[in-house]
């Protein structure tokens, strides 16, 4: 992307940093990871978890959610002002799982939010360490992206379920900051904007008064974030139109839906970060590893190296397949929910299956599920190779607008050719070409039509041996291109419902 120079790197977003050099960035990301690890160790002590229980991913998720809840100021304020029966706004908690007499039992714990905040700040040298909180949010978001398909949310806003590969980060909270905005897919941003416009249509005071002014600023900011994800002039020009509209309405919704469809071929740039559960960082810190001193990157070899040596366990329901559960978590850890399965399989070194073929439900266990027949097993999170995470969208040629793969949003910077059946996508673009954006629409359609499927994305980029830390010898895989490897396509994954 030509404008790369004006953008902050993920690590700067992740650490709210000013311009830093690579070493400073690695150190500040390392500091953030170390803080999460120290917090996790302290929480395991508080909860009297043994080593095995502390490495249980379900316990990790509960502890992570407690700290996110403790720092959710808006919700905390709302809860104080709207007390609901049986809910203490000052407390947070969740299920903690322990081994008792050879069986797993669920124990519901409750803590003062103030106490959790104190432990978190103490682990982070007295800071609020918002970057660490965002990091945890992105891990939860990546896990949701891997576990659930957002078809229903898409259909509700008048979009097509085929656009699920644009939905990265759709469950991220609004307060996730610049680092969160970077990992949101084009579809996620479009969905947020359409929801906003619909509210404005139904509630005439939405854009008015002091609150309306704030709403308007938020609307324009979201438009700019989305504009920044597009890589062609025509798509960006259309976003300017949407942003500058005096009174956003159905015309804007149509423009946004058109843009989302166009992003299936003219891919947006969406960041990918490997955010791991706290129960990976904790034991690493406990073993004496100094993340800040050693430095850490979310987009290089570091997460792969960390997962190679980590032991993480998971509870398994009676009819679930532990290998499938492992794949789910592996994909979440590598932010690979929308990557081509052939690329993921090559990197992982074992075949990665589409969601509908997995015999596993989500990682979290509902409070009404019976614990009697629940067992635990080791998650296999290691990989055969490592690869650099990308944010380019995989368009083949940046000078001339060109195609990225259709049903996926690439995670890894690894060469692949583009099998796609353009006709099905192009069929969606017949119809409305008049109105104020007609020339831009025509240009976008022309670019999409000229995109050639025989092109190659990430030319010359390969994967690396885990011993090749400096990424000196790229191994360029060759893929059988008879089928395109989308994780969700032709599939029936459960829906995510908030």
UniProtKB/Swiss-Prot annotation:
Compositionally biased tracts (Basic and acidic residues): 8-21
Q: Which family does it belong to?
A: Belongs to the influenza viruses nucleoprotein family.
Where does it primarily localize? virion
The compartments listed are: Virion; Host nucleus
What organism does the UniProt record list as the source? Influenza A virus (strain A/USA:Memphis/10/1996 H1N1)
| Motif interval(s): Unconventional nuclear localization signal | 1-18
Keywords recorded for this protein, A-Z: Capsid protein, Helical capsid protein, Host nucleus, Host-virus interaction, Ribonucleoprotein, RNA-binding, Viral nucleoprotein, Viral penetration into host nucleus, Virion, Virus entry into host cell
Q: What's the name of the protein? A: Nucleoprotein
User: What molecular function terms (GO) are annotated for this protein?
Assistant: RNA binding; structural molecule activity
Q: Which GO terms describe its cellular component?
A: helical viral capsid; host cell; host cell nucleus; ribonucleoprotein complex; viral nucleocapsid
Q: Which SUPFAM superfamilies match?
A: flu NP-like
Region of interest called Disordered, as start-end residue ranges on this chain: 1-21
PTM summary from the entry reads:
Late in virus-infected cells, may be cleaved from a 56-kDa protein to a 53-kDa protein by a cellular caspase. This cleavage might be a marker for the onset of apoptosis in infected cells or have a specific function in virus host interaction.
Coiled-coil zones: none
A Pfam short name: Flu_NP
For this chain the motif Bipartite nuclear localization signal maps to: 198-216
| Function according to Swiss-Prot or TrEMBL | Encapsidates the negative strand viral RNA, protecting it from nucleases. The encapsidated genomic RNA is termed the ribonucleoprotein (RNP) and serves as template for transcription and replication. The RNP needs to be localized in the host nucleus to start an infectious cycle, but is too large to diffuse through the nuclear pore complex. NP comprises at least 2 nuclear localization signals that are responsible for the active RNP import into the nucleus through cellular importin alpha/beta pathway.
Quaternary structure (record): Homomultimerizes to form the nucleocapsid. May bind host exportin-1/XPO1. Binds to viral genomic RNA. Protein-RNA contacts are mediated by a combination of electrostatic interactions between positively charged residues and the phosphate backbone and planar interactions between aromatic side chains and bases.
């Amino acid at each position: 992307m030509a404008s790369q120079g004006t953008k902050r790197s993920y690590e700067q977003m992740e650490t709210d940093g000013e311009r830093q050099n690579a070493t400073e960035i690695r150190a500040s990301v390392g500091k953030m990871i170390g803080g999460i690890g120290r917090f996790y160790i302290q929480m395991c002590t508080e909860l009297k978890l043994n080593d095995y229980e502390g490495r249980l991913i379900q316990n990790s998720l509960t502890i992570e959610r407690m700290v996110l809840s403790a720092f959710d100021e808006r919700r905390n304020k709302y809860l104080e002002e709207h007390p609901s029966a049986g809910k203490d706004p000052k407390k947070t908690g969740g299920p903690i799982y322990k081994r008792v007499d050879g069986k797993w039992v669920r124990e519901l714990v409750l803590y003062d939010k103030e106490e959790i905040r104190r432990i978190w700040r103490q682990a982070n040298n007295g800071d609020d360490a918002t970057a660490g909180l965002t990091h945890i949010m992105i891990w939860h978001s990546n896990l949701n992206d891997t576990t659930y398909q957002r078809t229903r949310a898409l259909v509700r806003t008048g979009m097509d379920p085929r656009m699920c590969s644009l939905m990265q980060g759709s469950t991220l909270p609004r307060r996730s900051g610049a680092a969160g905005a970077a990992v949101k897919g084009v579809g996620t941003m479009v969905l947020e904007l359409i929801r906003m416009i619909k509210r404005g249509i139904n509630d005439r005071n939405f854009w008015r008064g002091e609150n309306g002014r704030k709403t308007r600023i938020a609307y324009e900011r979201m438009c700019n974030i989305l504009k920044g994800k597009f890589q062609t002039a025509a798509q960006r020009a259309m976003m300017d139109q949407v942003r500058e509209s005096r009174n956003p309405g159905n015309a804007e919704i149509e423009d946004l839906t058109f843009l989302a469809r166009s992003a299936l071929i003219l891919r947006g740039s969406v960041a990918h970060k490997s955010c791991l559960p706290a129960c990976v960082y904790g034991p690493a810190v406990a073993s004496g590893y100094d993340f800040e001193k050693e430095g850490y990157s979310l987009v290089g070899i570091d997460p792969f190296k960390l997962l190679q040596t980590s032991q993480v366990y998971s509870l398994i329901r009676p009819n679930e397949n532990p290998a499938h559960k492992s794949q789910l978590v592996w994909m979440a850890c590598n932010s690979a929910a929308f990557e081509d399965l052939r690329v993921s399989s090559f990197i992982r070194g074992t075949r990665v299956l589409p969601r509908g073929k997995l015999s596993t439900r989500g990682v979290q266990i509902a409070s009404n599920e019976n614990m009697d027949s629940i067992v635990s097993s080791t998650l296999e999170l290691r990989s055969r190779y490592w690869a650099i995470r990308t944010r380019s969208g995989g368009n083949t040629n940046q000078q001339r607008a060109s195609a990225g793969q259709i049903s996926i949003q690439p995670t890894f910077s690894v060469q692949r050719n583009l099998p796609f059946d353009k006709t099905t996508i192009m069929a969606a673009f017949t119809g409305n070409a008049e109105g104020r954006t007609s020339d831009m629409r025509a240009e976008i359609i022309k670019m999409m039509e000229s995109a050639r499927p025989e092109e190659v994305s990430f030319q010359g980029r390969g994967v690396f041996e885990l011993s090749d830390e400096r990424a000196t010898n790229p191994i360029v895989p060759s893929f059988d291109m008879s089928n395109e490897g989308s994780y969700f396509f032709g599939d029936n994954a459960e829906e995510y419902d908030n």
